[in-house]
């Protein structure tokens, strides 16, 4: 050790000692190992830094993400997400390599947590100057700066103590959720409150940031307020929804109702590990919080959902598009907006419930009575999308208790199907969000009898494509759902149609913007169709006066949807696509210069038919609905000279939108016809006849 090679210099001893203190999990194990050798550890770190055998794969570039809302950012703490197949040992080695390379450059780092079980990666405290270095490490997929998440109820100082409004004998659900366990990620809770005593287990999990401000006092009743109230809404004895459900609480929000993305991630990882160690029945995770859009938080929710866990979250209280927030924007999460006693959107001062295509449904969220942390028998009213999400978590617990084998897709479809329809005043929402926001208020199903034979479908909107000439938008169904039809919508009316195509082993709906257009939406009709065999048949432009035609030619396959798009554009000289099954219900007919696509499915007992409704004079909106017992699977338009903006499904109704009638004239040539394809299960029809 007395001589130093000119090619390899030793680090100063004080720096090495400091580095050992900050090495994180790997370093801690080395320090605790009585046989560990100080010099060997240093040499190992130097070797890992200098040896660059594990270079990043060619053609792959790690990306950096941070919250779009600057006040919510937490610079200096980063979640490093590694590629999906990365093992724990590789995660730890990557973390050590980052520390070694940072130390050589004179930077100190601290590994706060190594993720394992939910997603591979680690949480590191380091200077932002090291981001470029970290992004070049092997196995790194992307890095996200940590950010804040917040409880989604009004502040505690606006609450008012109220005597209980409900009596136990007034609300008797068919199943209390006794077979379901609900995890609540929130503040601490007052577990000895009479509403939830014996129903909630407080875990030892806690990952919260320090409270803001030096004068903040951690008064127990304020620290427990949000979590106690929500636990009471979910399963309280008097004011709870699922009175039989058991709960486990994890503390991820501090006394001010503030947490972090990283703390929430570690909480979700805790749930996944608990699930693996001790498998139980159906699990519901309630996330009554919101932060800025987070790729890593959405990814963690996706992993947990695909492990069979139902996640329910608050849409957010920012009177904004829910797609801008996480976890509300995660497709695998059931996102809930808030309504009041009149089924209208909740207003909270200058703000209010979030809205938009990422919201699945709404639920009661204003002046909700629940357990108060002020005393063990006190009640309080609180408002917000947290309370709305708690209602849906309770409903989900009861539905899962009645049918424990339900998948997330089946549960979501049932929640939508049994909701109260078209009761919300859409004028409250911004004009550009009205068509995207579901007009649904959650309700308990009257009975699960016969639901297994019901054909459930929902409408999924894509994000807006943007205005560029070749822009496209893509709408996707959940993994357990079948895409039965595809349509498109453009506020300017300039679009090149839509088509169904395979992507990643699943069919997706892709819509095409047109020259001079302002952007387009793709609209997927996603259905539960067990044992289905579905395919898309395409006919290229026929260039014949009779138009382009395509049909379901396979034996036993029925037509569930039609779509059409232009391969090239002729600056608007083409007519809009004509989609009309004529004569037999298994044929799509379109313009001779368009490609026509038919969605054809074979499933036990499936039968379909076509319904049309036309208005001789031009109208801004034309609709046609399927009868009771039938489910809308396809929605398209048969236009004349009117400029059709698009067609889309709202519940069981096909809606065709056109330009303002003042710009289209009033001749019969401007007539528009809405074309619906309605399907049902013969098993359900037979069961209904037997009941009658």
Curated annotation (Swiss-Prot):
GO CC terms: cell surface; COPII-coated ER to Golgi transport vesicle; cytoplasm; early endosome; endolysosome membrane; endoplasmic reticulum; endoplasmic reticulum lumen; extracellular region
Modified residues (Phosphoserine): 47, 688
Region (C-terminal domain): 450-692
One of the GO biological process terms: lipoprotein metabolic process
Entry GO MF terms: apolipoprotein binding; apolipoprotein receptor binding; low-density lipoprotein particle binding; low-density lipoprotein particle receptor binding; RNA binding; serine-type endopeptidase activity; signaling receptor inhibitor activity; sodium channel inhibitor activity
Residue(s) at site: Cleavage: 152-153, 218-219
Name this polypeptide is given: Proprotein convertase subtilisin/kexin type 9
Gene: PCSK9
């Amino acid at each position: 050790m007395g001589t130093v090679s000119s090619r390899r210099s030793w680090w100063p001893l004080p720096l090495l000692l400091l580095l050992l203190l900050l090495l994180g999990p790997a370093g801690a194990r080395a320090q605790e190992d009585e046989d560990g050798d100080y010099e060997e550890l240093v040499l190992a770190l130097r070797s890992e830094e200098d040896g660059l055998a594990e270079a990043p794969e060619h053609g792959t570039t790690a990306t950096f993400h941070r919250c779009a809302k600057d006040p919510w950012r937490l610079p200096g703490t980063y979640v490093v997400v590694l590629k999906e197949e990365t093992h724990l040992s590789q995660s730890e080695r990557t973390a050590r390599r980052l520390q070694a390379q940072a130390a050589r450059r004179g930077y100190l780092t601290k590994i706060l947590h190594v993720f394992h079980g939910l997603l591979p990666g680690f949480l590191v405290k380091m200077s932002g100057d090291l981001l470029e270095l970290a992004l070049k490490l092997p196995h790194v997929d992307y890095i996200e700066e940590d950010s804040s998440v917040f409880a989604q109820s009004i502040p505690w100082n606006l609450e008012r103590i109220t005597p209980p409004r409900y009596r136990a004998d007034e609300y008797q659900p068919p199943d209390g959720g006794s077979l379901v366990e609900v995890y609540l990620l929130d503040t601490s809770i007052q577990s000895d409150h009479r509403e939830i005593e014996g129903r909630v287990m407080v875990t030892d999990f806690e990952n919260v940031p320090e409270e803001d401000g030096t004068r903040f006092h951690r008064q127990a009743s304020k620290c427990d307020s949000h979590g106690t109230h929500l636990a009471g809404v979910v399963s309280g004895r008097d004011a709870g929804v699922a009175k039989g459900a058991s709960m486990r609480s994890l503390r991820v929000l501090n006394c001010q109702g503030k947490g972090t993305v990283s703390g929430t991630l570690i909480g979700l990882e805790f749930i996944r590990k608990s699930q693996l160690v001790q498998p139980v029945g159906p699990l519901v995770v309630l996330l009554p919080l919101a932060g800025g859009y987070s790729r890593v938080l959405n990814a963690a929710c996706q992993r947990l959902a695909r492990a069979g866990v139902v996640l329910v979250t608050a849409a957010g209280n920012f009177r904004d598009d829910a797609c801008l927030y996480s976890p509300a924007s995660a497709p695998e999460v059931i996102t809930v907006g808030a309504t009041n006693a009149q089924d209208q959107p909740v207003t909270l001062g200058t703000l209010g419930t979030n809205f938009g295509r990422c919201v699945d449904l709404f639920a009661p969220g204003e002046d909700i009575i629940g357990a108060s942390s002020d005393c063990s028998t006190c009640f309080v009213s609180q408002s917000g999308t947290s309370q709305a999400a708690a209602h849906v978590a309770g409903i989900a617990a009861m539905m899962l208790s009645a049918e424990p084998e339900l998948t997330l897709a089946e549960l979501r479809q049932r929640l939508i199907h049994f909701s109260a329809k078209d009761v919300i005043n859409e004028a409250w929402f911004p004009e550009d969000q009205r068509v995207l926001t579901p007009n649904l208020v959650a309700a308990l199903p009257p009975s699960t009898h016969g639901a297994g034979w019901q054909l459930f479908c929902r409408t999924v909107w894509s994000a807006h494509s943007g205005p560029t000439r070749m822009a496209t938008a893509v709408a996707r169904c959940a993994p357990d759902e079948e895409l039965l039809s595809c349509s498109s919508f453009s506020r300017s009316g300039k679009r090149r149609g839509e088509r169904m195509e395979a992507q990643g082993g699943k069919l997706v709906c892709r819509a095409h913007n047109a020259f001079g257009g302002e952007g387009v939406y793709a609209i997927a009709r996603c259905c539960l169709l067990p044992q289905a065999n579905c395919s898309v048949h395409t006919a290229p432009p026929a260039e014949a006066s009779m138009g382009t035609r395509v049909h379901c030619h396979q034996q036993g396959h029925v037509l569930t949807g039609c779509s059409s798009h232009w391969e090239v554009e002729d600056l608007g000289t083409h007519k809009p696509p004509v989609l009309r099954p004529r004569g037999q219900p298994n044929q799509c007919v379109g313009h001779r210069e368009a490609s026509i696509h038919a969605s054809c499915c074979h499933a036990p007992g499936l039968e379909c038919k076509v319904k049309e409704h036309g208005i001789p004079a031009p109208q801004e909106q034309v609709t046609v609905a399927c009868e009771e017992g039938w489910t809308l699977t396809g929605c398209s338009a048969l236009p004349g000279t009117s400029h059709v903006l698009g067609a889309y499904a709202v519940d069981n109704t096909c809606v065709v939108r056109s330009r303002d009638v003042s710009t289209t004239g009033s001749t019969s040539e401007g007539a528009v016809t809405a074309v619906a394809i309605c399907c049902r299960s013969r098993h359900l029809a037979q069961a209904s006849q037997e009941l009658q």
